[in-house]
UniProtKB/Swiss-Prot annotation:
Species: Schizosaccharomyces pombe (strain 972 / ATCC 24843)
Primary localization: membrane
Keyword tags: Membrane, Transmembrane, Transmembrane helix
Domain of life: Eukaryota
Name this protein carries in UniProt: Putative uncharacterized protein C338.03c
Lineage: Eukaryota, Fungi, Dikarya, Ascomycota, Taphrinomycotina
Protein backbone atom coordinates (compact mmCIF):
# COMPACT_ATOMS: atom_id res chain seq x y z
CA UNK A 1 0.00 0.00 0.00
CA UNK A 2 1.40 3.38 -0.99
CA UNK A 3 -0.14 6.67 0.09
CA UNK A 4 1.18 9.99 -1.18
CA UNK A 5 -0.21 13.49 -0.82
CA UNK A 6 0.92 17.08 -1.25
CA UNK A 7 0.10 19.71 1.34
CA UNK A 8 0.65 23.46 1.41
CA UNK A 9 1.81 24.11 4.95
CA UNK A 10 1.93 27.90 5.18
CA UNK A 11 0.02 30.60 3.33
CA UNK A 12 2.65 33.33 3.61
CA UNK A 13 5.70 31.13 2.99
CA UNK A 14 5.80 29.05 -0.22
CA UNK A 15 6.37 25.70 1.40
CA UNK A 16 4.97 22.31 0.44
CA UNK A 17 5.16 18.98 2.23
CA UNK A 18 4.98 15.72 0.33
CA UNK A 19 4.29 12.63 2.37
CA UNK A 20 4.77 9.12 1.04
CA UNK A 21 3.85 6.05 3.07
CA UNK A 22 4.66 2.49 2.04
CA UNK A 23 3.31 -0.36 4.12
CA UNK A 24 4.45 -3.84 3.17
CA UNK A 25 4.77 -7.27 4.71
CA UNK A 26 8.45 -6.83 5.56
CA UNK A 27 8.95 -3.09 5.70
CA UNK A 28 7.21 0.03 6.89
CA UNK A 29 8.62 3.43 6.13
CA UNK A 30 7.37 6.98 6.02
CA UNK A 31 9.05 9.68 3.96
CA UNK A 32 8.27 13.36 4.38
CA UNK A 33 9.91 15.80 2.00
CA UNK A 34 9.55 19.51 2.62
CA UNK A 35 10.03 21.89 -0.31
CA UNK A 36 10.97 25.40 0.76
CA UNK A 37 11.02 28.21 -1.75
CA UNK A 38 14.43 29.90 -1.71
CA UNK A 39 14.80 32.29 -4.63
CA UNK A 40 12.18 33.65 -7.03
CA UNK A 41 14.69 34.53 -9.73
CA UNK A 42 16.64 31.29 -9.61
CA UNK A 43 13.53 29.15 -8.96
CA UNK A 44 15.55 27.16 -6.49
CA UNK A 45 13.99 24.77 -4.01
CA UNK A 46 15.47 23.03 -1.01
CA UNK A 47 14.55 19.45 -0.25
CA UNK A 48 14.63 18.11 3.27
CA UNK A 49 13.93 14.38 3.29
CA UNK A 50 13.12 12.57 6.51
CA UNK A 51 12.16 8.93 6.64
CA UNK A 52 11.39 6.34 9.21
CA UNK A 53 11.11 2.64 8.74
CA UNK A 54 11.74 -0.64 10.41
CA UNK A 55 14.05 -2.92 8.46
CA UNK A 56 16.68 -3.99 10.99
CA UNK A 57 17.01 -3.91 14.76
CA UNK A 58 19.71 -1.22 14.72
CA UNK A 59 18.85 2.46 15.01
CA UNK A 60 20.18 4.96 12.51
CA UNK A 61 19.33 8.53 11.64
CA UNK A 62 20.13 10.61 8.59
CA UNK A 63 19.00 13.91 7.09
CA UNK A 64 20.05 15.37 3.78
CA UNK A 65 19.39 18.79 2.33
CA UNK A 66 19.37 18.95 -1.47
CA UNK A 67 19.00 22.11 -3.55
CA UNK A 68 17.50 21.79 -7.02
CA UNK A 69 16.96 24.53 -9.60
CA UNK A 70 13.72 23.74 -11.38
CA UNK A 71 10.30 25.13 -12.19
CA UNK A 72 8.02 24.60 -9.19
CA UNK A 73 4.87 23.67 -11.12
CA UNK A 74 6.68 21.16 -13.25
CA UNK A 75 8.38 19.76 -10.15
CA UNK A 76 5.18 19.07 -8.24
CA UNK A 77 3.39 17.53 -11.21
CA UNK A 78 6.02 14.88 -11.82
CA UNK A 79 5.34 11.40 -10.53
CA UNK A 80 9.05 10.63 -10.21
CA UNK A 81 9.40 13.25 -7.50
CA UNK A 82 12.03 11.56 -5.39
CA UNK A 83 14.31 11.02 -8.38
CA UNK A 84 15.03 14.76 -8.36
CA UNK A 85 16.46 14.57 -4.86
CA UNK A 86 17.85 11.91 -2.60
CA UNK A 87 15.43 9.42 -1.09
CA UNK A 88 16.61 8.93 2.47
CA UNK A 89 15.71 5.68 4.21
CA UNK A 90 16.05 5.35 7.97
CA UNK A 91 15.42 2.68 10.51
CA UNK A 92 12.71 3.21 13.08
CA UNK A 93 12.94 6.39 15.17
CA UNK A 94 10.45 7.94 17.62
CA UNK A 95 8.01 10.07 15.69
CA UNK A 96 8.26 13.12 17.97
CA UNK A 97 12.04 13.27 17.80
CA UNK A 98 12.09 12.92 14.03
CA UNK A 99 9.45 15.36 12.84
CA UNK A 100 8.69 17.72 15.73
CA UNK A 101 10.88 20.49 14.32
CA UNK A 102 9.82 20.02 10.70
CA UNK A 103 6.02 19.88 10.84
CA UNK A 104 3.13 21.84 12.25
CA UNK A 105 0.95 20.19 14.87
CA UNK A 106 -2.05 19.48 12.63
CA UNK A 107 0.09 17.95 9.91
CA UNK A 108 1.99 15.94 12.49
CA UNK A 109 -1.27 14.50 13.82
CA UNK A 110 -2.23 13.57 10.26
CA UNK A 111 1.06 11.76 9.74
CA UNK A 112 0.67 9.98 13.06
CA UNK A 113 -2.75 8.69 12.05
CA UNK A 114 -1.39 7.36 8.75
CA UNK A 115 1.53 5.76 10.55
CA UNK A 116 -0.82 4.16 13.08
CA UNK A 117 -2.93 2.77 10.24
CA UNK A 118 0.17 1.25 8.65
CA UNK A 119 1.19 -0.30 11.95
CA UNK A 120 -2.22 -1.93 12.30
CA UNK A 121 -2.02 -3.31 8.77
CA UNK A 122 1.54 -4.52 9.29
CA UNK A 123 0.50 -6.24 12.52
CA UNK A 124 -2.37 -8.01 10.77
CA UNK A 125 0.02 -9.11 8.01
CA UNK A 126 2.43 -10.37 10.65
CA UNK A 127 -0.30 -12.36 12.39
CA UNK A 128 -1.53 -13.84 9.10
CA UNK A 129 2.01 -14.79 8.10
CA UNK A 130 2.50 -16.39 11.52
CA UNK A 131 -0.52 -18.64 11.09
CA UNK A 132 0.55 -19.48 7.54
CA UNK A 133 3.95 -20.51 8.92
CA UNK A 134 2.23 -22.73 11.48
CA UNK A 135 0.21 -24.44 8.75
CA UNK A 136 3.32 -24.94 6.62
CA UNK A 137 5.26 -26.40 9.55
CA UNK A 138 2.40 -28.81 10.28
CA UNK A 139 2.59 -30.14 6.73
CA UNK A 140 6.23 -31.11 7.28
CA UNK A 141 5.59 -33.09 10.48
Amino acid sequence: MVISSVFSAFADIPSVYLISVNCGARELWLTITSIHFVSLREQRYEFLANSLGERTSSLKSQEEMVSVSRNGKQLLSEASFFRLGKHVHLNFLPFENTFEMALRNDFQIFCTSILFTCYIQSFSLLISNFFIAIEVSRSFF
